[in-house]
Curated annotation (Swiss-Prot):
InterPro entries: AB_hydrolase_1, AB_hydrolase_fold, BioH, Carboxylesterase_BioH
Primary site of residence: cytoplasm
One GO cellular component term: cytoplasm
Keyword Mitochondrion: no
One function term, GO molecular function aspect: pimelyl-[acyl-carrier protein] methyl ester esterase activity
Binding site for substrate: W22, S82, L83, F143, L144, A145, L146, Q147, H235
Gene: bioH
Domain AB hydrolase-1: 16-240
Gene3D superfamilies membership: alpha/beta hydrolase
Name of protein: Pimeloyl-[acyl-carrier protein] methyl ester esterase
Cell membrane among keywords: no
């Protein structure tokens, strides 16, 4: 049986869908709940094949976006972290009329490094795919450790991420490989350049997976969007700097919500 895990909580009147990253599940947002629920109606989703959304086969980015969108409210703000940022971006491209605004966190429209583009070396992503079949759990743990590297609370944050994975059903090797394949091959740089809805990109200064150079490059090629780099954060800024992160989200939605209402 395939069923998408979807939990809705919060006292606010604005819908905000939160999409997690590779290998994880919606529990990764636990530290943000008390900060966001007074202001938003939060939609916590386990992406297809991850956490409690079991029974799905590996799929393309477009297929994943379609499945998530089918369960979503008619209109919402969308926030995607890492791989979730690609899914949220694809949703904004597919059905922009259903997206009030898009927030990507430690994400890139093109995760794989290219000659003119900073990112993860393709052979590193391919290596992770190979290692999954050799030592599943250790490979996932290595990837999680990379996400917090360099922060003041790196060990504590890595333990939190590990507990998020272990406390819910584990994704299969097929699902994890499929996610890495999306990270290795997706390139939404040109597609998103034409997006006209509010777009905020949040980065961690210490992020070893999405280099901060990406922020400057997209500032130039996507002038309609804005970016913020959180100084002491790595790949999971909402875990290492939750108060600053929540303030950034609240400000962006408040400012752009007013702009959207005035434009309608």
């Amino acid at each position: 049986m395939t069923a998408l895990y979807w939990q809705t909580i919060g006292e606010g009147d604005r819908d905000l869908v939160l999409l997690h990253g590779w290998g994880l599940n919606a529990e990764v947002w636990s530290c943000m709940l008390e900060r966001l629920t007074p202001h938003f109606r939060l939609h916590l989703v386990d992406l297809p094949g991850y956490g409690r959304s079991q029974g799905f086969a590996a799929m393309s980015l477009e297929q994943m976006a379609e499945i998530v969108l089918d369960a979503a409210p008619a209109q919402a703000w969308w926030l995607g972290w890492s791989l979730g940022g690609l899914v949220a971006s694809q949703i904004a491209l597919t059905q922009p009329q259903r997206v009030h605004g898009l927030i990507t966190v430690a994400s890139s429209p093109c995760f794989a490094a290219q000659d003119d583009w900073p990112g993860i070396r393709p052979e590193v992503l391919s290596g992770f795919q190979h290692q999954l079949s050799q030592d599943f759990q250790r490979t996932v743990e290595r990837f999680l450790a990379l996400q917090t590297l360099g922060t003041e609370s790196a060990r504590q944050d890595a333990r939190l991420l590990k507990s998020v994975v272990l406390n819910q059903p584990m994704p299969s090797v097929e699902i994890l490989n499929g996610g890495l394949e999306i990270l290795r091959t997706a390139d939404l740089r040109q597609s998103l350049a034409g997006l006209s809805l509010p777009l905020l990109r949040i980065y961690g200064y210490l992020d070893g997976l999405v280099p901060r150079k990406v922020a400057g490059l997209l500032d130039v090629s996507w002038p309609h969007s804005s970016s913020i780099i959180i100084a002491k954060a790595a790949h999971a800024p909402f875990i290492s700097q939750p108060d600053e992160f929540a303030e950034i989200i609240g400000t962006f939605v408040a400012e752009n919500g007013i702009c959207r209402q005035n434009a309608q």
